[in-house]
Amino acid sequence: MQRVYAFEDGDGTNKKLLGGKGAGLCTMTKIGLPVPQGFVITTEMCKQFIANGNKMPEGLMEEVKKNMQLVEKKSGKVFGGEENPLLVSVRSGAAMSMPGMMDTILNLGLNDKTVVALAKLTNNERFAYDSYRRFVSLFGKIALNVDDEVYDKTLENKKVEKGVKLDTELDANDMKELAQVFIKKTEEFTKQPFPVDPYAQLEFAICAVFRSWMGKRAVDYRREFKITPEQADGTAVSVVSMVYGNMGNDSATGVCFTRDPGTGENMFFGEYLKNAQGEDVVAGIRTPQIISKMAEDADLPGCYEQLLDIRKKLEGYFHEVQDFEFTIERKKLYMLQTRNGKMNATATVRTGVDMVEEGLITKEQAIMRIAPQSVDQLLHKNMPANYAEAPLVKGLPASPGAATGAVVFDADDAVEQAKGKKVLLLREETKPEDIHGFFVAEGILTCRGGKTSHAAVVARGMGKPCVSGAEGIKVDVAKKIAKIGSLEVHEGDILTIDGSTGCVYKGEVPLEEPQVGSGYFGTILKWANEIKKIGVFANADLPSAAKKALEFGAEGIGLCRTERMFNAVERLPIVVKMILSNTLEERKKYLNELMPLQKQDFIGLLKTMNGLPVTVRLLDPPLHEFLPTLEELMREIFEMKLSGKTEGLAEKEVVLKKVKELMEVNPMIGHRGIRLGTTNPEIYEMQIRAFLEATAEVIKEGIKTHAEIMIPNVTEVNELINLRKNVLEPVHEEVEKKYGIKVPFMYGTMVECVRAALTADKIATEASFFSFGTNDLTQGTFSYSREDSENKFIPKYVELKILPANPFEILDRPGVGEVMRIAVTKGRQTRPELLVGICGEHGGEPSSIEWCHMIGLNYVSCSSYRIPVARIAAAQAQIRHPREN
């Protein structure tokens, strides 16, 4: 097995082996772009390194040395040479892009001797020692785990001492002194000599990159974005000959996107810094210039035109938006990296539509490029169209959308405070180790850095609004204060940012809901509907929720939870009285009070849906859930007796008695659903009557209806037979007689008990449709209580890889999924036209939707805000696993 590949020998399509960065360098070499010489160490070596207890695989360094000698031969330079030294960068790169998650070391090979040679060769002492101090700080931080504050404070102190603001204002002697102080401080921190042998440095660096794969921020990023080992397993290491953007004003470094990664607009987008190294742009240490200004830059003749040509070549080859890094060394341009651009959902959607219209890709390819979970970003709120207040300050619009939150100055504080409120992370510049703060923040605001800085790239990838480079803000992290002009912003103060314009506003701004069905996203959703075979319904309990569902593209209501209608403030007291009733007559009296209220809700739903399916699930939870808890009542009664208060005491004791009567050892598999409807048929009778009368009244108004009655917790076909004969048919006859019309409806069941799935052939003799309740079906199949397991052991099981994921979030295909497949197969043996859907929370989760498509379900039902996600996921499922209907 080949373990190291020269750029000209590597297969650029094999990102799994060479990593995205290595594969990109190989591809750029292949298509004739100017790439420095170098080689890639494969991801397999990273996996072996970790499996060996973080030890270098045997013989690997010998192979690295052979490849380094080839680079020496091609370049005419010598690694560690004291006359013409070869210096390299050591870069990480996994199969999937993880901006800022992994580590890069520049200028490797420098020591006290090679730096003198570099100064002589370039006739630029300042450049040589600037490169040296950068190398020491990067190497110390990444390879030796030195706290970067050690270097940052030393550099800041030197600038203060010299009375300057920018690194570029320090002279050669300053850089010399900084390099030696950095080495001394590194040795003090590590209690060991700084490595001077270039091959020792290289081995340290390769090990550091391999180790970073299992570093906290890389693991957190993979967990947040659900990046599995199948998608990316280990990081490759690219060893690249150094080229320098910090050799003077005829040198530069930059980052570009072939299209705008924030909006998707087909315009060249990027930034560059003169007399700088690549990490300066990405780290956001200085705020760069926009790339178009290079066209007028007399120090860099022809470079902008060359970049435009490279932009065209990259998109022509990859048919994807590319994010690339370049360096210009003394007017000569080199490409250091290209990868598929990390864009927010807005840009991904627009570029997809535009590329289809440009003939670069197909509709199917455009849809497959959208990560379904990223669709949530398109539902972000925005600033009001005509907002008149002047902003406090303006930065760069780095990631679109608007966000309001309480200001925090530290990622750890963001995590802590986000547990109770919305937070906005405000930093001078962000670093990769701030990633945990990004996850919880509503938005990110930085004082330094451009649109291609770490903060901007990661925020766009997460779909978080971001304003970067707001230089009018001065932050004092120690005091947790920011100054914007004369205004002091303290931790906890509210700010609003607009990532689409770069504006920052004082206080909370009322934000507007997005428009889902129009524009580029509307086009993508239209294409998704043309492709997908599985319907997308909504879980909705009120007419207002149904209206919102239609706006998002729902094709029906797959679950109306009637118990939620009982929980309204004016209804709950009636429900409680019904439960406390001692006689059937008394119970019916209160049910009769509830009936017209439920009927009005049903009328609203049916009218809103206007002929689309409305599936009403009859009462599901046990009755005790509508009453106060035993502990609550006992405490209240104890306190009343203790204080001598007697008013209302008798009523409390009546409720306590009923709560004790209704108490169950295991209520989740107890007296609920059809069992309750069988022992207390008057409850289901009221609900059926309300729904059928609502259907009749809507029909009489000339509005189409598609009414479906769904029974929960069925385990035995006789439960359905009993309910049909003794309740459903008599009520249906009475309603048709009362209104003098036919009132059509469908009668079906939830399949949420394992026995129902295993006897689906019998149950299908009664039920004309099934709907999987996968929350309870998962509980039953695993014998896990959801409430207990999610808090106690499932996270540990996922961490230890006992389970691949939380089965209550992502459908368990081998177990729960197989039970579903059995039910579908058996049910359709009895009733070939059987309609089958899913209405558990899995109905909006992309992987689960794919499984539902694969086993032949007719529809999925999910919350309104998951409908666009489900539509995209359903189309992707059809593209991956085509079926006829």
Curated annotation (Swiss-Prot):
Mg(2+) binds at E752, D776. It catalyses: pyruvate + phosphate + ATP = phosphoenolpyruvate + AMP + diphosphate + H(+). The active site is at H454 (tele-phosphohistidine intermediate), C839 (proton donor). ATP binds at R91. Its EC number is 2.7.9.1. InterPro entries: ATP_grasp_subdomain_1, PEP-util_enz_mobile_dom, PEP_util_AS, PEP_util_C, PEP_util_CS, Phosphohistidine_dom_sf, PPDK_AMP/ATP-bd, Pyruvate_phosphate_dikinase. Residues 1-342 are annotated as: N-terminal. The keyword Transport does not apply. One of its GO terms (molecular function) is ATP binding. Residues 343-399 are annotated as: Linker 1. Coiled coil: none annotated. Residues 534-885 are annotated as: C-terminal. Residues 498-533 are annotated as: Linker 2. Its cofactor is Mg(2+). Residues 400-497 are annotated as: Central. It is an enzyme of class 2 (transferase). Homodimer. The reaction takes place in three steps, each mediated by a carrier histidine residue located on the surface of the central domain. The two first partial reactions are catalyzed at an active site located on the N-terminal domain, and the third partial reaction is catalyzed at an active site located on the C-terminal domain. For catalytic turnover, the central domain swivels from the concave surface of the N-terminal domain to that of the C-terminal domain. PANTHER family: PHOSPHOENOLPYRUVATE DIKINASE-RELATED, PYRUVATE, PHOSPHATE DIKINASE 1, CHLOROPLASTIC. NCBIfam families: PRK05878.1, pyru_phos_dikin. The N-terminal domain contains the ATP/Pi active site, the central domain the pyrophosphate/phosphate carrier histidine, and the C-terminal domain the pyruvate active site. Catalyzes the dephosphorylation of phosphoenolpyruvate and diphosphate to produce ATP. Belongs to the PEP-utilizing enzyme family. This is Pyruvate, phosphate dikinase.
